[in-house]
């Protein structure tokens, strides 16, 4: 399986954000990285009561701390593999309440509208088949017991989401699919992929997370799982669960300080320790398992090491090294070689692989670099 190197403009964002008056806020955010416009956020929010925000539009559901942390302030170039199980942006209505020690968000969400393909699928399902858009109900709570400490923060969070089938699914209506790349946007191969799980009645996802900082040290870990509950009239199999977890930490070497956004319940921009900036060392381990009860989508683990250089508050240089270890079931829906058969020939069929436990599957090293402007 040849893995090509590559370059890309990972994100090219253009946004307009405005506090319209003391009570109302509006935002529209787009991405032009692929040469076409992709809608990100389109928000109207009421924030006239301290600690309370009510917003409507297209935005990220409050579920995963990794998903909700803006890409500008990620510890590594890409989010962990298991984040693919977390819901992202959907049309919806959400309420958030926060104070220093407690944070809560709850919302009702509909379809995902990130491009023309999803919009067309929604319109066709409505016009031709009269299908409902599909709703999701997502809630999250966070406790912050160290809110009185000026040099540290502790984030203890949990979230749950009940999800109906969406008419914007580009796989099939009434289907689930769990897939992920190996925490990279350059290697486009999706080693982990259950393919389409038909007969979906609803999904249930939940997560538990711990995060925080102490002076220049930042740490974060989470467990996520998502299950497809099937309609027995269509698919008589049991619930199909996929899950994974990660743990990561970083440290600013020259006296800088990590920071935490209490209103958003997530990490935010660092404070450099020197006039010329600061350097951050980071390490992460992650594991993701898409081998459900009846669909073998593969599992993988990744070891990552990173160096982040912040010459100013709006510029970031990143170098990441990553080792990826995929199992024999991580064959990209049967498209990738994962071992050898009894005759010694490469095979894509995991049932024919003769290598012992831990020997089959695609393993590889990766080195990546990013130059980033963070407005």
Report the location of each language-model feature.
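Outer membrane beta-barrel
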Residues: 1-124, 128-166, 241, 246-273, ...
């Amino acid at each position: 399986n040849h893995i090509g190197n590559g370059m890309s403009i990972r994100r090219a964002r253009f946004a307009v954000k405005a506090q319209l008056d003391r009570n109302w806020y509006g935002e529209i955010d787009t991405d032009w990285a692929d040469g076409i416009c992709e809608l990100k956020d389109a928000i109207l929010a009421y924030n006239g009561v301290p600690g309370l925000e009510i917003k409507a539009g297209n935005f990220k559901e409050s579920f995963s701390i990794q998903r909700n942390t803006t890409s500008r302030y990620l510890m590594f170039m890409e989010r962990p593999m298991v984040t693919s199980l977390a819901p992202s942006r959907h049309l919806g209505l959400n309420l958030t309440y926060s104070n220093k020690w407690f944070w809560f968000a709850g919302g009702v969400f509909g379809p995902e509208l990130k491009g023309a393909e999803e919009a067309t699928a929604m319109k066709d399902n409505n016009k031709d088949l009269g299908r409902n858009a599909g709703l999701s109900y997502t809630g999250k709570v966070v406790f912050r017991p160290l809110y009185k400490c000026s040099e540290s923060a502790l984030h203890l969070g949990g979230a749950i989401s009940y999800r109906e089938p969406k008419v914007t699914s580009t796989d099939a209506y009434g289907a689930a699919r769990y897939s992920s790349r190996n925490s990279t946007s350059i290697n486009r191969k999706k080693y982990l992929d259950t393919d389409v799980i038909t007969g979906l009645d609803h999904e249930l996802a939940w997560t538990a997370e711990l995060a925080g900082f102490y002076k220049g040290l930042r740490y974060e870990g989470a467990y996520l799982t998502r299950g497809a509950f099937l309609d027995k009239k269509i698919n008589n199999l049991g619930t199909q669960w996929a899950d994974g977890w990660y743990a990561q930490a970083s440290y600013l070497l020259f006296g800088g300080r990590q920071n935490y956004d209490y209103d958003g319940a997530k990490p935010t921009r660092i404070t450099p320790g020197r006039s010329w900036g600061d350097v951050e060392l980071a390490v992460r381990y992650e594991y993701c398992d898409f081998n459900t009860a009846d669909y073998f989508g593969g599992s993988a683990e990744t070891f990552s090491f990173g160096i982040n250089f912040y010459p100013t508050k709006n510029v970031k240089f990143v170098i990441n090294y990553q080792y990826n270890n995929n199992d024999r079931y991580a064959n990209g829906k049967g498209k990738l070689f994962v071992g050898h058969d009894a005759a010694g020939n490469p095979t894509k069929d995991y049932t024919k692989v003769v290598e012992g436990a831990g020997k089959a599957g695609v393993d590889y090293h990766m080195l990546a670099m990013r130059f980033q402007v963070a407005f």
